[in-house]
Amino acid sequence: MSALAGPKIAKIIAPKKNHQKISIYTFGEPRVGDHHFNSVLEASVPEIYRIIHKHDIVAQIPPPGMTPFTKSQYFHHKTEIWYNNDMTEGVPFMICSKKNECDETFVKTHANINDHLTYFNLQNSIE
C-alpha cells in the first residue's frame, strides 16, 4: 500500500463503527502527516505499524522540521518495526512504540534506496 493512500484510508474508516478491527502495515513509509493527522489516524486505527528496512531513505523524508513549501511539520505515526538486517526469516527486529524512537538509530550517511527496494527478500522496482 502506498503511504499516499493514508489520508484516504483515514477518511474512509473514520466514520465507521468497526474500525477497531482494522490493522494497517506499511513498508518504507515516508512521513505523511502532521500531528493532527497522526492523532486522528492512531485513534481511528489502533493497530497501525510502519515496517522499516535498515537504512531505508524513503522512511526519512520529508526530514523532521518545518517544510518550506507547506509551512507544516510532518511526523511518523507510531508504531515502527525496524529491521537492522537483511530481513530474512527469523532475524531479530526492534519495536519502537514511541514516535521517532527508532529514528535515533538511523545514520544519515548510511541512507540508501536499496533498503527501500528490498523488503523480506522481495525486490521492488522503480520502473
Regions found by a protein language model. Give the residues of each.
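Non-catalytic, mobile gating and regulatory segments of ester bond hydrolases
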Residues: 3-127
